[in-house]
Every structure is written in structure tokens, then in C-alpha cells.
Amino acid sequence: ANLSEQYQRGDLENLLALFDASAHMERGDKKQIRAEYGELFRNSENRALYIWDVAWSGDGKLTRGEGSYQARVLRKGDGSPQIRSGAVTIEVIQRNDKPLIVGLYHKADY
């Protein structure tokens, strides 16, 4: 299953399994990724993540994808979802023949 599927399911452990131990995002390391997505999943009824128009480039070790994203989150008790969209960068390495995310960065347009 991919990042968007685990995000939509709110499956924290399987989402985290897509990330390498050394993974980072804007606000910190894998511990921060766990904390932020855990809070989001606990406090939302419904989520969707769309990523498209990704252009991939790589140097053999690191593969970088740059594209667009939209996240829709319906928080518990809210009547309508919050929608954020913008640019996303995903950095991936191969470890034991498995792709793992080492960087996930997004910039919302609001």
C-alpha cells in the first residue's frame, strides 16, 4: 500500500513503515513524523491525500520526486473538511530492495 492509502486509512504503523529510520520532514525526524500523523489520525474522521504530476530524478542512491499534493482532512466535530494544496518533494532510497521515504517536504499554497 502506498502513502496516500495509509494516510486515508489513518493507519499510523503502516504509514510509518514506509519511512526509513533516518527520515525527516520540515519539522523534524521520524519521531516528529509519528507524533504529527498520530495526532492527525486521532483527531480526524476522514482524510484523503492526492499526489500528482511527480517528476522523478535520481543519482543512483537517492531518488527525488517533485510534484503537487492536496490533503483533505475532516476533523472530528467539524462540518466540512480543511483542504490544503501545494508542492511536495519526496526523497526515497532503496534499502534491502525496498523503497523507503527518507524525506517528505511540502509547501502549502493555502
What feature does the model see in each segment?
Residues 6-22, 26:
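Short, well-ordered alpha-helical segments enriched in acidic and aromatic residues
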Residues 3, 15-16, 33, 92:
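Hydrophobic pocket/interface hotspot
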Residues 38-85, 89:
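Surface-exposed, charged secondary-structure patches
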Residues 26-35:
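Short, charge-rich amphipathic alpha-helical segments embedded
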Residues 22-25, 71-73, 107-110:
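Solvent-exposed loop/turn segments at secondary-structure junctions
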Residues 64, 82-110:
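Short beta-strand edge/turn micro-motifs at domain boundaries
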Residues 31, 55-59, 108-110:
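Exposed acidic/polar residues on beta-strands and adjacent loops within beta-sheet cores, strongest
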